[in-house]
From Swiss-Prot:
Signal peptide: none annotated. It comes from Nitratidesulfovibrio vulgaris (strain ATCC 29579 / DSM 644 / CCUG 34227 / NCIMB 8303 / VKM B-1760 / Hildenborough) (Desulfovibrio vulgaris). Residues 4-145 form the Flavodoxin-like domain. Pfam families: Flavodoxin_1. NCBIfam families: flav_short (TIGR01753). Belongs to the flavodoxin family. This is Flavodoxin.
Length: 148
């Protein structure tokens, strides 16, 4: 049984909802899923033992890309997670009326690539309420499963 880790940072609950929806889809497909709030993780060796790692973070800020507060310590310590060679994908929620719509997804993907991780699927970017985008989330989770 493949093992997947999902780590998310959520302030309003949107990214948490997205993470939960993805987790259900992966579990239904036979994955053993470990889903964690970024506020409760430590970076050291975090990714070890997982076949797939999914990172979710909402984007904040008008003038620059701001990651969700709980996710910042993990982002700053990604080099300690064991990312090299790991299969990863990213997701996030945001508001397309802002210049840096879901910019956190881009920032996390770029850092993971620089650390030698393999991005297996383009990042999922949800505009507004993820409940209205449930089909997109389910489809993305299906695509991620097929990419590994």
């Amino acid at each position: 049984m493949p093992k997947a880790l999902i780590v998310y940072g959520s302030t309003t609950g949107n990214t948490e909802y997205t993470a939960e929806t993805i987790a259900r889809e992966l579990a239904d497909a036979g994955y053993e899923v470990d889903s964690r709030d970024a506020a409760s993780v430590e970076a050291g060796g975090l990714f070890e033992g997982f076949d797939l790692v999914l990172l979710g973070c909402s984007t904040w800020g008008d003038d620059s890309i701001e990651l969700q507060d709980d996710f910042i310590p993990l982002f700053d310590s990604l080099e300690e997670t064991g990312a090299q060679g790991r299969k990863v994908a990213c997701f996030g929620c945001g508001d397309s009326s802002y210049e840096y719509f879901c910019g956190a997804v881009d920032a996390i993907e770029e850092k993971l690539k620089n650390l030698g991780a393999e991005i297996v699927q383009d990042g999922l970017r949800i505009d507004g309420d993820p409940r209205a985008a449930r089909d997109d989330i389910v489809g993305w989770a299906h695509d991620v499963r097929g990419a590994i």
